[in-house]
Swiss-Prot record:
EC number: 7.1.1.2
Transmembrane segments: 2-22, 70-90, 100-120, 146-166, 172-192, 223-243, 253-273, 294-314
MF annotations from Gene Ontology: NADH dehydrogenase (ubiquinone) activity
Pfam families: NADHdh (PF00146)
Recorded catalytic activity of this chain's protein: a ubiquinone + NADH + 5 H(+)(in) = a ubiquinol + NAD(+) + 4 H(+)(out)
HAMAP family associated with the record: NDH1_NuoH
Protein name according to UniProt: NADH-ubiquinone oxidoreductase chain 1
Cross-referenced PANTHER family: NADH DEHYDROGENASE SUBUNIT 1 (PTHR11432), NADH-UBIQUINONE OXIDOREDUCTASE CHAIN 1 (PTHR11432:SF3)
Amino acid sequence: MFIINTLMLVAPILLAMAFLTLVERKILGYMQLRKGPNIVGPYGLLQPFADAIKLFTKEPLRPSTSSVSMFIIAPILALTLALTMWIPLPMPYPLINMNLGVLFMLAMSSLAVYSILWSGWASNSKYALIGALRAVAQTISYEVTLAIILLSILLMNGSFTLSTLITTQEKLWLIFPSWPLAMMWFISTLAETNRAPFDLTEGESELVSGFNVEYAAGPFAMFFMAEYINIIMMNAFTTVLFLGTCYNPYLPELYTINFTIKTLLLTMSFLWIRASYPRFRYDQLMHLLWKSFLPLTLALCMWHVSLPIMTSSIPPQT
């Protein structure tokens, strides 16, 4: 039964990821006053499947000087971790209802750094290695603010379980009392998923394509899939944390529909930002985090800790 449940979670995620690639190309096309993919199938709807067939039937070439095992393990690990992070998300029922669901997701996103680092190092290419080092520095840096913002939200939630956020936000979305945190969280998720304007890892003019420059066919597709699955997952996580949906036990479908619509709107904003903003310079990227976000999130976290102590003389319940 557990295998069936897992498949029922994985299959829609993969399908959503496939169509997100198409939607992105369409939206970018229309924003640049062109059509986007429109040949394969009606309105180009079968384009993702054509891409998948093409990529997975090609020969997976690898550089002769690369480290074979690590070169192959890296994309598999990236995709596995991207799918694993969906386990504790309540939609409205999680696959496994974990007591420490938030910590699990933080741990999984930290592990994803290894797949990037291994891919860059195993490629034995200077461009791939520079891209990987950039990606790792960026991901680790922005995880600091993500963790502090999560801690502030959990102080309001009173539990590490994601399902209790539904109860916490029955009357009021957490985005209203903590909108500065929500804004910083959204920008940090952009950086965490290596999306524009923070896609420093794949600066075409300098690094060709970033850490996956030596990859082709199936392994390349796996990195691509992991990236887009992470985008959807981060937006779903944002929905759970800040835009909690009212849950009716008699109509759980309403929760799922509401949750999906919010996640889709957030994902659209990711695509809109990509079409609108130029890429940051690397020092600007790091200054934004260490000199702006980190002091502000720490101050807000201390505020959320001190508020219950000041108002009702109780320590925050977690």
